[in-house]
């Protein structure tokens, strides 16, 4: 079984991923670009602030009523750093197969390439110590890099448990062949493979759309992985952003 790191079971939703308790690293206020994407008042996915007006997330996180929270660490507390924004425009990548989202049961031939989407905020974000954009990559990530994934996804692989605070986990950037061997679904050159081959470090349910930062550089966003999460020899898959830098920049420029 596979899951998009949100819930493919949702009619308008996606897939999600989360880090395990034993592999967490301190995350509070260290990821000022991390964004919480909601459908109505329910948390759905992570996202990444690219500039004051734009958030990047996964295309499988598409929904019909977005709300975005920036500067947030704890879901249960009203924090002084919180910024709430609506979304004026959602632009999934034109080559992402949106038909995969409508109560679709994942199949071995499914191709989740191009799993990214831009959200234009209805009001620009205020840049503060805990709300800051991150730049797009300008070069390929290096295999073996230490990567950091973050999110509010499940910290347990089967009976999902969700943290109050933003969680981070260190993962290793692996050859795509490792994911291709581990999974039946297609792994393409528009994807990255990251995890720990002995398990225990992973993204999971509701981490979708969150950042994958390798050697300090944004290189991916969480896309899909195995179910249950964190299985040994079954790393997760991330959208490879260097492949989409031109589309992202052009789309932002053409939608001022």
From Swiss-Prot:
<feature type="region of interest" description="Activation peptide homolog">
    <location>
        <begin position="18"/>
        <end position="24"/>
    </location>
</feature>
<keyword id="KW-0862">Zinc</keyword>
<dbReference type="GO" id="GO:0006508">
    <property type="term" value="P:proteolysis"/>
</dbReference>
<dbReference type="InterPro" id="IPR043504">
    <property type="entry name" value="Peptidase_S1_PA_chymotrypsin"/>
</dbReference>
<dbReference type="GO" id="GO:0004252">
    <property type="term" value="F:serine-type endopeptidase activity"/>
</dbReference>
<keyword id="KW-0721">Serine protease homolog</keyword>
<keyword id="KW-1015">Disulfide bond</keyword>
<dbReference type="GO" id="GO:0051897">
    <property type="term" value="P:positive regulation of phosphatidylinositol 3-kinase/protein kinase B signal transduction"/>
</dbReference>
<feature type="signal peptide">
    <location>
        <begin position="1"/>
        <end position="17"/>
    </location>
</feature>
<dbReference type="InterPro" id="IPR018114">
    <property type="entry name" value="TRYPSIN_HIS"/>
</dbReference>
<dbReference type="InterPro" id="IPR001314">
    <property type="entry name" value="Peptidase_S1A"/>
</dbReference>
<dbReference type="GO" id="GO:0046872">
    <property type="term" value="F:metal ion binding"/>
</dbReference>
<dbReference type="GO" id="GO:0008083">
    <property type="term" value="F:growth factor activity"/>
</dbReference>
<dbReference type="InterPro" id="IPR009003">
    <property type="entry name" value="Peptidase_S1_PA"/>
</dbReference>
<protein>
    <recommendedName>
        <fullName>Kallikrein 1-related peptidase-like b4</fullName>
    </recommendedName>
</protein>
<feature type="disulfide bond">
    <location>
        <begin position="204"/>
        <end position="229"/>
    </location>
</feature>
<dbReference type="InterPro" id="IPR001254">
    <property type="entry name" value="Trypsin_dom"/>
</dbReference>
<keyword id="KW-0479">Metal-binding</keyword>
<keyword id="KW-0339">Growth factor</keyword>
<dbReference type="Pfam" id="PF00089">
    <property type="entry name" value="Trypsin"/>
</dbReference>
<comment type="subunit">
    <text>7S nerve growth factor is composed of two alpha chains, a beta dimer composed of identical chains, and two gamma chains.</text>
</comment>
<feature type="disulfide bond">
    <location>
        <begin position="147"/>
        <end position="214"/>
    </location>
</feature>
<feature type="disulfide bond">
    <location>
        <begin position="45"/>
        <end position="61"/>
    </location>
</feature>
<feature type="binding site">
    <location>
        <position position="77"/>
    </location>
    <ligand>
        <name>Zn(2+)</name>
    </ligand>
</feature>
<feature type="disulfide bond">
    <location>
        <begin position="179"/>
        <end position="193"/>
    </location>
</feature>
<keyword id="KW-0732">Signal</keyword>
<comment type="similarity">
    <text>Belongs to the peptidase S1 family. Kallikrein subfamily.</text>
</comment>
<feature type="binding site">
    <location>
        <position position="84"/>
    </location>
    <ligand>
        <name>Zn(2+)</name>
    </ligand>
</feature>
<feature type="domain" description="Peptidase S1">
    <location>
        <begin position="18"/>
        <end position="253"/>
    </location>
</feature>
<dbReference type="GO" id="GO:0007264">
    <property type="term" value="P:small GTPase-mediated signal transduction"/>
</dbReference>
